[in-house]
From Swiss-Prot:
Entries under PANTHER family matching the protein: APURINIC-APYRIMIDINIC ENDONUCLEASE, ENDONUCLEASE IV ENDODEOXYRIBONUCLEASE IV
The protein's name in its UniProt record: Probable endonuclease 4
Similarity comment text for this entry: Belongs to the AP endonuclease 2 family.
Catalytic activity, EC: 3.1.21.2
One Gene Ontology MF term: zinc ion binding
Residues annotated to bind Zn(2+) 1: H69, H109, E145
Residues where Zn(2+) 2 binds: E145, D179, H216, E261
Gene: nfo
Catalysed reaction equations from the record: Endonucleolytic cleavage to 5'-phosphooligonucleotide end-products
Pfam hit, one: AP_endonuc_2
Lineage, broadest ranks: Bacteria, Pseudomonadati, Pseudomonadota, Gammaproteobacteria, Enterobacterales
Length: 285
């Protein structure tokens, strides 16, 4: 079964994220559990936690259908020790918030070397950051998102994701989220079913589908291989409809949150309905 939704606002209270997801007939959703552009947030209150859990129960969202995202400020591969420690503390806090809310996944961007250390050193720092966070939490899986490779961001190659996973001690609590726009911008073609087959065969060989814990379904304003992260509405960008139809008809993407981060929230309900409709076509093996 496909879990299809969008990254919805939690403005006014975390419970509102579940309500907003239900309003667009989503069967999954993503959210920030705190302001994504600030380092610190007030601790979650018992009332906030209870209201969120009650809303999820009311609208039938389990933890398998919810993909929280961490703060954009966090860089788990930071080359400077003091800044790295600050990011690690913030990431642990994000993991603990998920733990309190009964959520089992936390999606994050891996990190950037800032042109100050090697890719290998940065990837090792990211893996160690994950190890530290996993050691201090329970029940939450760290879900590494592939990137478009803008600037000095790592995670744009499947090999980067594999290297991070290789350095994580508890393999049962690490996974990946593949963003289609990021993959396309990083040079993984998705414009035809044949290209989708090739890209995900590479993913299966290098990373492994057992680690796929979520996806971001975004078309791309950015061009192929441009290393530029610019999302677009489904079918309106340079990827086109075929990739998303292919994903919907492929059972390897069942049982994980498939999340829209497309640019027009006003048509999310339409995009979700379109994605759901594609499942009725002939299934892809």
């Amino acid at each position: 079964m496909k879990y299809i939704g969008a990254h919805v606002s939690a403005a006014g209270g975390l419970a509102n994220a579940a309500i907003r997801a239900a309003e667009i007939d989503a069967t999954a959703f993503a959210l920030f559990t705190k302001n994504q552009r600030q380092w610190r947030a007030a601790p979650l209150t018992t009332q906030t936690i209870d209201e969120f859990k009650a809303a999820c129960e009311k609208y039938h969202y389990t933890s398998a259908q919810i993909l929280p995202h961490d703060s954009y400020l966090i860089n788990l591969g930071h080359p400077v020790t003091e800044a790295l420690e600050k990011s690690r503390d913030a990431f642990i806090d994000e993991m603990q918030r998920c733990e309190q809310l009964g959520l089992s996944l936390l999606n994050f961007h891996p990190g950037s070397h800032l042109m100050q250390i090697s890719e290998e050193d940065c990837l090792a720092r990211i893996a160690e950051s994950i190890n530290i966070a996993l050691d201090k939490t329970q029940g939450v899986t760290a879900v590494i998102e592939n990137t478009a490779g803008q600037g000095s961001n790592l995670g744009f190659k499947f090999e980067h994701l594999a290297a991070i996973i290789d350095g994580v001690e508890d393999k049962s609590r690490v996974g990946v989220c593949i963003d289609t726009c990021h993959a396309f911008a990083a040079g993984y073609d998705l414009r035809t079913p044949a290209e989708c087959e090739k890209t995900f065969a590479d993913f299966a060989r290098i990373v492994g589908f057992k680690y796929l814990r979520g996806m971001h379904l975004n078309d791309a304003k950015s061009t192929f291989g441009s290393r530029v992260d610019r999302h677009h509405s489904l079918g309106e960008g340079n990827i086109g409809h075929d990739a998303f139809r292919w994903i919907m008809q492929n059972d390897r993407f069942d049982g994980i949150p498939l999340i829209l981060e497309t640019i027009n929230p006003d048509i999310w309900a339409e995009e979700i309905a379109w994605l759901k409709a594609q499942q009725t076509e002939k299934a892809v093996a």
